[in-house]
């Protein structure tokens, strides 16, 4: 499993940046736009955008930390103090059981690199207009399918990059990069 350190500020500001471009959106749309931005960033640069851990859930990949942040905002409580603190950047309301997220502040774009912004904007362009069903089907790629069948639903960044058609050289770079970042390669 390739592990990277989660950059909490980058995760927060990536979500805020997405919302600043698309307006209020449901969890699903935000998660999938971020997932495809992560995939593109891995393919092109050998590094994830946020380092968040993606879980293979029934409707596609879900970033764990961002999910905890949104749930903390929605419930105004969390067992995770950090998620509760970061949740203040969002307002979550439900309409017909669907959770919609609205930012309560602007993103700090200094937390995002030019390549992060490029990947997010490309993902928005490619995925914003897709229906729930279309983006779900698109996100059910080989990385999702592999993790979804496993006892642990955590998706490997190497599998995510491979499903995004990263070159063999880039896949090798991702392995080395993950080893150097966390010393937790297994």
Range-by-range predicted roles:
Residues 1-186:
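Domain-edge interaction signal
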